[in-house]
Amino acid sequence: MADQLTVEIIAAIKNLAQSENGGRIPAAIGDITADRQLTSLGIDSLALADVLWDLEQAYGIRIEMNTADAWSNLKNIGDVVEAVRGLIAKEA
């Protein structure tokens, strides 16, 4: 079972994926879990920058990487969750 942070980040990424795909996610994608690759949801580097900005605002953190670095390091939703979790812990 996913923890609250994972659920919230999946919801944020799902909302972004829907907006990137004309308001819906194709049924062929299936369930969105932490293992889901960002590219499989139609999230490109520009959309990833939006996600990172939203997460910074939501959790009061600063993600110290440019979008190119983020794109190479954050391949799936779980990578995003763990990056945010680490930054939240550092801020505490």
From Swiss-Prot:
O-(pantetheine 4'-phosphoryl)serine modified-residue sites = S45
Annotated signal peptide: none
One of this protein's Pfam families, by short name? PP-binding
Domain Carrier spans what residues? 4-88
Task: Name the job this protein performs.
Answer: Proposed to synthesize nod factor fatty acyl chain. Involved in trans-2,trans-4,trans-6,cis-11-octadecatetraenoic acid biosynthesis.
Source species: Rhizobium leguminosarum bv. trifolii
- What PTMs does it carry? 4'-phosphopantetheine is transferred from CoA to a specific serine of apo-NodF.
Provide the organism lineage as a comma list: Bacteria, Pseudomonadati, Pseudomonadota, Alphaproteobacteria, Hyphomicrobiales
- What's the name of the protein? Nodulation protein F
